[in-house]
Amino acid sequence: MTFRTRRKRLNKVLLFLRRSRAPRMASGSDGGGTLAEPVTPAPRAPGGRNRMWIVIVAILIVAIIGISTYAVLSARVPTKVGIELWYNNDGHYGDTETALALTLQNSIQSCGRVTVSLKSDPWAVYKQNWANQRMPMFLLGWYPDYFDSDDYASPFLSIAGAKSLGSFYNNSQVDQWITEEQSTVDPNIRTDRFTKIQNALADDVPYIPLFSGVAQTAYVNSVQNVELHPVVFKWFIVDKPGATVLNVSTSDKVISLDPASAYDFFSGEIINQVFDTLVVYDWKNATLKPGLAQDIPTRANGLVSADGMNYTYHLKAGVTFHDFPLNTPLTAQIVANSINRAIRLDLPGSAAFLLYDVGALGRDATNGNNSSPGAIEVVNSSTITFHLARPVSFFNDLMAFSVSAPVPDSYNQAGEQPSTAGSVIGTGPYKMTTHTPNQLIVLDRAFGTKASNTYYNKDLYSPTLGPIPIMDRIVINIRASAAALKQDIETKAVDVVFRTLSPPDLVDLQNRASSLGITVKLGSSPQIRYLVFNVNKVPNKLVRQAIAFSVDRSAISQIVFLGTASPLYSMIPAEMPYSTAVFQSKYGDARCADANNLLAQVPATIELIALARDR
């Protein structure tokens, strides 16, 4: 009932009451309707007037209550709740995103109480959308930054991480549990804290885990050393005997090649060919090896303090940046400056929080928004020590991630460095000589030649692999669709395709691999896919829980991925330690009755329509 309608009804009540108090008129004796003289009322009993007013007030109160009750009853929860579901539309996750969004839309809407409007944007805009809080519910994927279960918890559920990834979840108790699991290697404590963290995730539902897929690539049979690494793809180990150039194609796109900004898989993939970090990963697995540092810090070698709060790295000699002709030498001060630059800039959607929050280096406004005073100590030109605010058991892993890559002091200190050829300067095995956005990237050997390799870490994987980089040049063609990738490898226009063939194309290539002379390689993938709720735009937990009940993971796997996707019931995948399938026990799949029961409990005063507003 509208306010105007309620007002009209109240006016009618008041008019009736006024008329009931008006003097009564005698009827005309001739029946002609003329007014007679007023009839003198009978004398009232003492107190009668007061009783009349009490009756009038009582009638008014009853009328107002009745009208208000009718208004509340007529404003019950609407039959349909509206919400927007956003997805990427330019191939960042391959050609399956539209089908995935449609399948989710159907499973949510099939419960009958929610309508889902689909919206999409290219990745560069999409990334800004979640930073600017334009999207109430949206699809994302996650590839690990470091190989610890914490990397599936703190980036999503810590206050700083949730802001970076667009949920804006804020739970100080969960923050405390995260800090406690990060600070110990005791499996009993970590089991307890990860259990509590995952239970809070299932109760608060800032995210809904959906599925994990398979890693995939296809390449001509003459190509060697194509490894589906659990953290980062390494082009510098790939070999095509008898050739000096490797041609590849992908449907992925670069967002930023500044280590202080990049926080997507493909940007990180390129960064890891051009930059080095203090420690790096083995070519096949997540075992750490020395990169820019001489050794991996441990308590055993004295480079990690007994309390786990101090990590010391000694730099290898002779390392220079490929800022030719300067050939700037790497120093401990440059490493410190690079870490502080990432922390100070704290660019939107970046991984800076892995340093100042997860890595316990701090971000102090009294120190120019750099790390906390004393957190980074330059001992001498080749030695740096990090003094953490608390123990972080996987700090070495954080130093292996791209956000920790040293950059020369010539980099922009007030904002993001351009991702153009000549502006991207690292110490890695390749330098980027060409970058045509969304079309082409060319990586060339940075130091010496194959016959005279002067790269400081060329024997990193010897004797298993020869000196790195193996190929002189990597030409990365950026395609507009998965169909183009399939055509590239069918015709052998390229040597390797990576990220991302569509499920039907993948099956077709597997069936014809022998006749085509190609290898189709599949591997387990640590990547997860999930729904994000911006809890500022969808603040009612019951709404988020209702949608969690309505999701149908089996439909996603069968319809979108032809049965190749595995259902995911926690943000920590089943292959990782401490994983608990909390969403399976609490929500299951496609439980519409439970979803609708929750929506029926939502107070009528709560706004359910969570549509994005332009900002």
Spans of model-derived segments:
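Secretory targeting signatures
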Residues: M1-P78, K537, I547, I609
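Detector for C-terminal structural segments
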Residues: A26, I64-I65, T96-N106, K127-S256, ...
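Surface-exposed binding/hinge segments that line
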Residues: A42-R44, S222, Q333-I334, R344-Y411, ...
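Short, well-ordered beta-strand elements
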Residues: K80-G91, V116-L118, A243-I255, M309-H314, ...
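Structural transition elements
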Residues: G82, G91-A99, Y430, P567-T605, ...
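Aromatic-rich, solvent-exposed beta-strand/loop patch
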Residues: G91-G94, I237, H387-P406, A421-A484, ...
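N-terminal lobe/hinge region of extracytoplasmic solute-binding protein
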Residues: S249-V304, I425
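Aromatic- and charge-enriched surface segment that lines or borders ligand/interaction sites
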Residues: D295-A351, T385, D488, P539, ...
